[in-house]
């Protein structure tokens, strides 16, 4: 659901760029100014600026900002190591942690009146899912070679006609389940908030749903990251 955001529209209009909530053309520049892309740039800028200003110079005795980031980053690092092993966690921490922070903020930004969540677009969630899906196959092939794909045909040759279609459907279903789960939940939150804002004003009536929206936003980010970790660990262990 696309809410009008005046200051972004004004800035882009003054720069001669397509307004994100107006008609969007077919050129590359116009595509980059579509609503979900505009808010993606906004989320990325927010994460960069917040980390820059809250961290500053790292100190031996950390301040409040450094303590906050050490808690978040340290917690994710321990979780990844417990579920994937230390070596694999170190290798994929930048990617998965970036996904976690991006998805959490992208989900939450839609709770601000006049903003929308980039993850309320299937384009965003499918792009994230494709990266995860492709990476977990790369991990499996790198760890086990062609033997990684033997689980698609089952342990016995006579089971191939049965196991191959089942395994292929199951594997490609991950693309749908991971992307549509995130998209569907966040889109439902956006639609419900939009209806309540329109019917009951900007503050009191939507407040309970906004509180629930915070929980949904964080839980969906956690679910996406958890499943990513599980897929990567399975690919490494060759256990499906």
Curated annotation (Swiss-Prot):
The main location is: membrane
CDD domains (UniProt xref): ATP-synt_Fo_a_6 (cd00310)
Compartment(s): Cell inner membrane
Gene3D superfamilies, per the entry: ATP synthase, F0 complex, subunit A (1.20.120.220)
Tell me if Cell inner membrane is a UniProt keyword of this record: yes
Q: Name one GO biological process term.
A: proton motive force-driven plasma membrane ATP synthesis
SUPFAM superfamilies from the xrefs? F1F0 ATP synthase subunit A
Q: Report the membrane topology from the UniProt record.
A: Multi-pass membrane protein
Question: Which Gene Ontology terms cover its molecular function?
Answer: proton-transporting ATP synthase activity, rotational mechanism
Which parts of the chain span the membrane according to its record? 41-61, 92-112, 121-141, 152-172, 191-211, 212-232
Q: Per UniProt, what is one Pfam family of this protein? A: ATP-synt_A
Q: Which GO terms describe its cellular component?
A: plasma membrane; proton-transporting ATP synthase complex
**Highest taxon above the source species:** Bacteria
Q: Identify the keywords attached in UniProt to this record, alphabetized.
A: ATP synthesis, Cell inner membrane, Cell membrane, CF(0), Hydrogen ion transport, Ion transport, Membrane, Transmembrane, Transmembrane helix, Transport
Q: How does it assemble?
A: F-type ATPases have 2 components, CF(1) - the catalytic core - and CF(0) - the membrane proton channel. CF(1) has five subunits: alpha(3), beta(3), gamma(1), delta(1), epsilon(1). CF(0) has three main subunits: a(1), b(2) and c(9-12). The alpha and beta chains form an alternating ring which encloses part of the gamma chain. CF(1) is attached to CF(0) by a central stalk formed by the gamma and epsilon chains, while a peripheral stalk is formed by the delta and b chains.
- Biological function: Key component of the proton channel; it plays a direct role in the translocation of protons across the membrane.
Instruction: Family membership, please give it.
Output: Belongs to the ATPase A chain family.
What name does UniProt use for this protein?
Answer: ATP synthase subunit a
Q: Which species is the source of this protein?
A: Desulfotalea psychrophila (strain LSv54 / DSM 12343)
Give the lineage: Bacteria, Pseudomonadati, Thermodesulfobacteriota, Desulfobulbia, Desulfobulbales
């Amino acid at each position: 659901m696309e809410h009008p955001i005046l200051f972004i529209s004004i800035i882009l209009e003054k720069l001669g760029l397509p307004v994100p909530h107006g008609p969007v053309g077919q050129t590359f520049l116009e595509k980059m100014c579509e609503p979900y892309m505009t808010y993606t740039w906004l989320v990325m800028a927010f994460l960069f600026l917040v980390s820059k200003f809250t961290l500053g110079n790292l100190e031996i005795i950390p301040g409040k900002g450094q303590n906050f980031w050490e808690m978040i980053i340290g917690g994710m690092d321990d979780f990844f190591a417990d579920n994937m092993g230390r070596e694999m966690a170190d290798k994929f921490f930048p990617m998965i942690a970036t996904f976690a922070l991006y998805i959490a903020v992208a989900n939450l930004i839609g709770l601000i009146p006049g903003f929308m969540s980039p993850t309320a677009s299937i384009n965003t969630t499918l792009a994230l899912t494709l990266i995860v899906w492709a990476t977990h196959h790369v991990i499996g092939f790198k760890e086990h070679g062609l033997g990684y794909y033997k689980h698609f045909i089952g342990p016995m040759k006579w089971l191939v006609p049965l196991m191959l279609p089942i395994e292929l459907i199951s594997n490609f279903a991950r693309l749908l389940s991971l992307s549509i789960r995130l998209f569907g939940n966040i889109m439902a939150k956006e639609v419900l908030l939009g209806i309540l804002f329109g019917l009951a004003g900007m503050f009191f009536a939507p407040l309970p749903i906004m509180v629930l929206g915070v929980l949904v936003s964080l839980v969906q980010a956690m679910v996406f990251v958890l499943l990513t970790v599980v897929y990567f660990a399975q690919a490494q262990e060759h256990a499906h």
